C-alpha cells in the first residue's frame, strides 16, 4: 500500500490496513497470528534478557 501511495501518511496507511484486517475471517488471520507467535519465540530465544523500553 505504501509503494502504491508514496505520499500517503503512515497514519492513513495504518487505518486502512486495520480496516482490511477487521474484514478478514479468523481462518484468514491465522497464518499471520501463527507467524507472529513463531517470531516472538525466536526473539525471546535470541534475546532472553530483552526488555522493551520506549
From Swiss-Prot:
Keywords, alphabetical: DNA-binding, Nucleus
Gene Ontology CC, one term: nucleus
Cellular localization per UniProt: Nucleus
Transmembrane segments: none
GO biological process: developmental process
Coarse class of the protein's main subcellular location: nucleus
Identification of the protein by name: SRY-related protein CH3
Amino acid at each position: 500500500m505504501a509503494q502504491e501511495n508514496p505520499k500517503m501518511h503512515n497514519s492513513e496507511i495504518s487505518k486502512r490496513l486495520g480496516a482490511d484486517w477487521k474484514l478478514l475471517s479468523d481462518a484468514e488471520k491465522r497464518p499471520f497470528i501463527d507467524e507472529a507467535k513463531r517470531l516472538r519465540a525466536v526473539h525471546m530465544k535470541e534475546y532472553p534478557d530483552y526488555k522493551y523500553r520506549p
